[in-house]
């Protein structure tokens, strides 16, 4: 199972279909109209508050260690995807910044698009074993989403997949920082 499948299961496809229904000339079937009406009835009111500090600019990755230290992290999981962060030297700069700030870390790479649950489970176990209290995701949306899933899995008992299937509500999550490598991810602010 991939975490990208969660989007499809939890309304992404329905939301997309709902948007298509507003296209002039698009015809809705009776079944589509009933589904949309039922979804509207089931909507829940909510407040959304998600403060996010964004540090932007050339060379800001060199501040990673200091920024993580501001969050009072005592041990960090550096979570990343493909070899591009290694080849570019970015991962080494992150490691150096953490070392200069005196913050111990462990690493877990190998995130692929639509992250695999097996890697999330591996990350959860690594974080628990190493007493990690902060996750630093270095990459794009899939790395960030995988890091979030690991954060929820560490902070809550049971199977992290239950949260994605809405069987349980998460009580917390490890703090997560991001060194974003792609401008279009969007995952970094939620």
Regions found by a protein language model. Name each.
Residues 30-42:
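Short, Lys/Arg-enriched N-terminal segments with co-localized hydrophobic residues
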Residues 1-7:
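Short, small-residue-biased leader/transition segments that mark boundaries at the very start
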Residues 77-78, 134-136, 177:
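Conserved beta-strand elements of the Class I
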Residues 59-102:
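Small-residue-rich anion-binding loops in enzyme active sites
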């Amino acid at each position: 199972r991939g975490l990208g499948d969660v989007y499809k299961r939890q309304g992404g496809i329905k939301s997309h279909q709902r948007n298509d229904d507003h296209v002039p000339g698009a015809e809705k079937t009776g079944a589509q109209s009933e589904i949309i009406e039922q979804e509207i009835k089931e909507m829940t009111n909510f407040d959304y508050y998600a403060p996010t500090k964004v540090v932007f600019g050339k060379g800001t990755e060199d501040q990673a260690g200091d920024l993580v230290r501001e969050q009072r992290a005592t041990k960090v999981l550096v979570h990343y995807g493909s070899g591009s962060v290694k080849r570019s030297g970015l991962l080494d700069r992150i490691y150096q910044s953490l070392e200069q700030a005196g913050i111990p870390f462990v690493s877990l790479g190998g995130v692929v698009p639509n992250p695999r649950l097996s890697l999330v489970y591996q990350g959860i176990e690594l974080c628990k074993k190493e007493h990690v209290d902060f996750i630093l995701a270095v990459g794009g949306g899939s790395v960030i989403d995988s890091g979030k899933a690991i954060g929820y899995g560490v902070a809550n008992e049971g199977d992290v997949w239950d949260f994605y299937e809405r069987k349980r509500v998460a009580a917390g999550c490890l703090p997560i920082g991001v060194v974003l490598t792609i401008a279009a991810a969007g995952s970094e602010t939620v």
